[in-house]
Every structure is written in C-alpha cells, then in structure tokens.
Amino acid sequence: MVRVAAYVDGFNLYFGLKAKHGRKYLWLDLQGLVTSLLRPGQTLQQVTYFTARVRNDVDSEKRQSDYLDALAEHSPLVTVVDGRFQEKGRRCRQCGTTWTVREEKETDVNIAVALVEDAVQDRYDTALLLSADSDLCPAIRAMKRLRPDKRIVAAFPPRRQSGDLKQAVDAFLYIGDDKIRQSQLPLTVITAAGIVLNRPKHWT
C-alpha cells in the first residue's frame, strides 16, 4: 500500500471555502475529506492541519475551539499545528488614518518544515498538500532533492490554484464541491468527557 500523509493549509482552505460557499461547509471533516481524495492502493497515515488560534473575538474563538475539539474527537488521524497572529499597523495615504490589522504568521513555514522532515523520516510515500500557496514551492523542491523517491500531489481548495505549484508537484487536482458536501462532521459531536459540540449556527 502507498502511504499518504496530508498537509492542510487551514487559512487557504478556509478562505477558499468562504469564497465559494460562504460559511455553509466550514464544519469540515478533514480526515473524511482527505480519505475521499485517495486512490485505490493508497492508505492514509496522518492529516496535519495548520492554523492559528483566533484571539480578541469571543464568538469566533468559541466557534474555532468547538471545531478543533470536534475534529480531535471525530478524526483521530488529525493533528493540529498552531501558528500565530501578528498585529501590524496600517495607514491611509490619503487621510492619514491609522489602524491595526492582524496577520496570520508561520503557517507556510510550519507546513514546509513538516513536509521535508516527514519525507526525510520516511513517514509517507506520497504527500497530499491541500493548499494553493506558491510560497511552498521551495520546500517542495527541497523535499524532492532530499527524497526523490517521494511524490507530492497538490489538492487545490475551491477558487484557489497556483501555476507555480502545478509546476513544482508531481500531480494536482481540484477539490470538488461534492467531496466537500459529503465530508461534513456530524451536526453534534460528543466527546469522551461528555461535552456536546454542535455545529455553530453561524456556519449555515
């Protein structure tokens, strides 16, 4: 069997889903989705989900926390790797107004490190990359130099693609609406501790 490890760019996937479907399919079963993308003769080893914790918004924090807890309970092959948000000042050139925005940091670096490290440690035969971030191309090239026996396939989220990534990987595919629709977590997930986690009403 061909061992597959999946690497999910959380923000690339999130914004692709929102652009195409709004919040309708954010309660996504990542393990189920990746499994639906496998080909005959492939077996899923792990799903690594790269994201960053929301801060300074109580409602958003709870929705994200409930989702991650539901994933942990329902999808045992999923591991979450946290990046971070960094505050950055912005200034309007015309009126001089200033404001602060929060930018997600470290996700692409974390994916790059995991992709290369897992290849060197022989944790997969094929890497499935759910992202359209061309910043990952150098890591892909490094991985293939170090382990030319490994394959990498890009799975582009809705309304996301990259010509540079298409050139860097061995193959690519587009994640179809039917796969996303059929890969939703149960509306209610109950943890081993008896905690009830419901899909947020906001995600409809």
Each PLM stretch: what is its role?
Residues 1-102, 151, 155:
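Domain-level signal for Mg2+-assisted phosphodiester chemistry and nucleotide/NA-binding surfaces
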